[in-house]
Amino acid sequence: MTSRNYLLLTPGPLTTSRTVKEAMLFDSCTWDDDYNLGVVQTIRQQLVQLATPADGYTAVLLQGSGSYAVEAVLGSVIGEQGKVLIVSNGAYGARMIEMAQLMGIACHPYDCGEVSRPDAAAIEQILQNDPAITHIAMVHSETTTGMLNPIEEVAELAKRYDKRYIVDAMSSFGGIPLDIAALNIDYLISSANKCIQGVPGFAFVIAREAELAACKGRSRSLSLDLYAQWRCMEDNHGKWRFTSPTHTVLAFAQALKELAQEGGVSARHQRYRNNQRRLVAGMRALGFRPLLDDSLHSPIITAFYSPDAPQYRFHTFYQKLKDQGFVIYPGKVSQSDCFRIGNIGEVYDADITALLAAIDNAMYWKQ
């Protein structure tokens, strides 16, 4: 394992490399061409290249967490006469529904339950019965449970029924291969501190340029106006409308270099998948049960049922692991008592082996 205070086994913020951290030791002027042209514009181009080889897409960077970018997309691209079908099977789909409702956006929620995979036939039925729907929005990797949702099936429906397609790929972009042009995705949303393995501070949207260009004047917010942010970056060669998180941006530029050095998204996906499979096998050997069937798992994070022991307390288990150098995540599923373990970031085979040994040592209810 690399030198650190503890290993973050979370879906982001996550454990970053020493060199990503060191990239933040430099200061940048937000008006300077070395920063805007040399760093910001390069990042925008690289993000589009990671998303698709096709022309006609652009990247917009936005200060804040991933949820800021999700709200910016919903509030900026759906017009007053628009209506969005939001597919929800976890906290992050539910958050999109809440955002739409607070902004007064017409919304058709489809909640299929936290441990159920969205059903394409049910989505098609909704589209047939509600022709007012103009947009479809869904989460790709739902970290509430660790489920990987079927964005390919929904992409086919979006194309067939001529709907604009919004995908929250917060914890999948950069860690799971995808081509947004092939999937007919109009807006893909992700964040600096997920699979690219940067640090928190900004999110980004990769958008079909023709669609984004039609969104002038639609935004329900000043600071979360995606169109205005895009035009500022386009017209001023990488300049942000408001203060740029310069140190986070420098860290992200380094993280993109390290993604390329690893072999790109496919190689990183293979590492994440190997981590997750090794984790699940080891946890089963220790007596833990995954919340989901193996066929539903993403390679990002896995939820496990809490031990059926009267003396078990998550906080005690958590602290015993932290004392050994590992940090895990509490559960977020409303109907099941569980906890979650992520395996993205600077996490390798040796780390999973060490984690499993630490978990075995932390099972105080067995002692």
Swiss-Prot record:
| GO biological processes | organic phosphonate catabolic process
Keyword annotations from UniProtKB, A to Z:
Aminotransferase, Pyridoxal phosphate, Pyruvate, Transferase
Question: Where are residues bearing N6-(pyridoxal phosphate)lysine located in the sequence?
Answer: 194
The reaction(s) catalysed by this protein are:
(2-aminoethyl)phosphonate + pyruvate = phosphonoacetaldehyde + L-alanine
Question: Which Gene3D superfamilies does the UniProt record give?
Answer: Aspartate Aminotransferase, domain 1, Type I PLP-dependent aspartate aminotransferase-like (Major domain)
Q: Write down the required cofactor(s).
A: pyridoxal 5'-phosphate
Q: What is its EC number?
A: 2.6.1.37
One Pfam family it belongs to: Aminotran_5
Functional summary from the UniProt entry: Involved in phosphonate degradation.
**Family to which this protein belongs:** Belongs to the class-V pyridoxal-phosphate-dependent aminotransferase family. PhnW subfamily.
The name under which this protein is listed is 2-aminoethylphosphonate--pyruvate transaminase
Q: What is the lineage of its organism?
A: Bacteria, Pseudomonadati, Pseudomonadota, Gammaproteobacteria, Enterobacterales
